[in-house]
Regions:
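Phosphate-binding/catalytic loops
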Residues: 63, 69-127
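Conserved active-site segments centered on acidic
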Residues: 1-60, 124-127
Length: 127
């Protein structure tokens, strides 16, 4: 998303972050096959340690996108979502479905395409 926003010259209008809903990956860097997919599509990234979503994230960010029903349920249970900030990423593209987790499927390309489809729709409606 950062690259899409930068390419559209709207960097000043967005602050983008990523966080896990569980604590099982906290501190881990980007999964190596995910890095390969990012490189293939010229998406810049840097070494980082995963972090868990915080109460401050819900207060601070205008939109919180999740990729599967379990994360949607967990996030809404945690935050209540009175402001309607939390939504399934594919719903942005008009599809009420999960984005398959490439950790389990091994299909990082399909996941990349789904994410791009959804974010392109979101960004086209935001500008």
């Amino acid at each position: 998303m950062k690259k899409m926003v930068k390419d559209a010259r709207h960097e000043e209008e967005f602050e983008i972050s990523s966080a896990a809903t569980s604590d099982e990956v906290i501190g881990y860097d980007i999964y190596p096959p995910a890095k390969e997919c990012l490189r293939k599509h010229d998406i810049p990234f840097q070494k980082r340690g995963a972090r868990q979503v915080t109460d401050e994230d819900y207060s601070y960010y205008d939109h919180i996108f999740v990729m599967d029903w379990a994360n949607l349920r967990d996030m809404k249970r945690r935050f209540g979502d009175e402001k309607g900030k939390i939504q399934m990423l594919m719903s942005l593209a008009g599809e009420e479905r999960e984005i398959p987790d490439p950790w389990y499927t091994g299909d990082f390309e399909s996941t990349y395409r789904d994410i791009c489809t959804s974010l392109n729709k979101f960004l086209s409606e935001s500008f």
